[in-house]
Amino acid sequence: MISLSDFVNRFQLQLPPPPKRLSDNNRHAAVLLPIICKPKPTLLLTRRSATLRSHAGQVAFPGGVADPKDKSIIATALREAEEEVNIPHQKVQVLGQLAPLNSSGGYLVTPIVGLLPPGLSLHSNPAEVAKIFEVPLSEALSLSSYHYLDVSRRGQQHRVYFYWYQQHLIWGLTATIIHQLAQQVQV
């Protein structure tokens, strides 16, 4: 099990890996990786609403597309987290960010890592989020939990990570982001 202080120290001492084959588009998005500061820290995830046009019913971090009014990509992640699951932006202690990743939808997604105090009154925006749940941070960061498939998409090979947590299949970009974080802190 990793303690919160060990996680923070490892995260802040390691540079994120260099980005891989980033797209040249201007479609930017951000997600918040909310780590809840409990005695046994947890990582907050959501199950997207079944009525959404894209990625319906999938497990995801709170986040979304950058708005022209956002002052930074961090502001995008914080705004989206507040809209989707009622995380007050002033309650998030931003630790930093991981290397941006290309999404299958053509966005350049920047993962923002932030700490949350325990006991926040979170509730989902039902138009976007069907469920909020937490995964023990030590389990999410265990590299041995991950499996992967190598798939070909648009003529390029992609590694798709996945793992199960209880009844939740965590896969695709979300699992790739967690896997990237796990590699960075090497639990």
Swiss-Prot record:
Domain of life according to the entry: Bacteria
Q: Name one GO molecular function term.
A: magnesium ion binding
Which residues does Mg(2+) bind?
80, 84
User: Where along the sequence does the record place the motif called Nudix box?
Assistant: 64-86
Assigned EC number: 3.6.1.-
A biological process (GO) of this protein is:
nucleoside diphosphate metabolic process
Which parts of the sequence belong to the Nudix hydrolase domain?
Answer: 26-157
One Pfam annotation reads: NUDIX
The cross-references to SUPFAM superfamilies, in alphabetical order and at most eight, read:
Nudix
Cofactors (names): Mn(2+); Mg(2+)
Leader sequence range is none
Alphabetically list the UniProt keywords: Hydrolase, Magnesium, Manganese, Metal-binding
Annotated function:
Probably mediates the hydrolysis of some nucleoside diphosphate derivatives.
- NCBIfam families on file: PRK10707.1 (NF007980)
Name the record gives this protein: Uncharacterized Nudix hydrolase NudL
Q: Which organism is it from?
A: Photorhabdus laumondii subsp. laumondii (strain DSM 15139 / CIP 105565 / TT01)
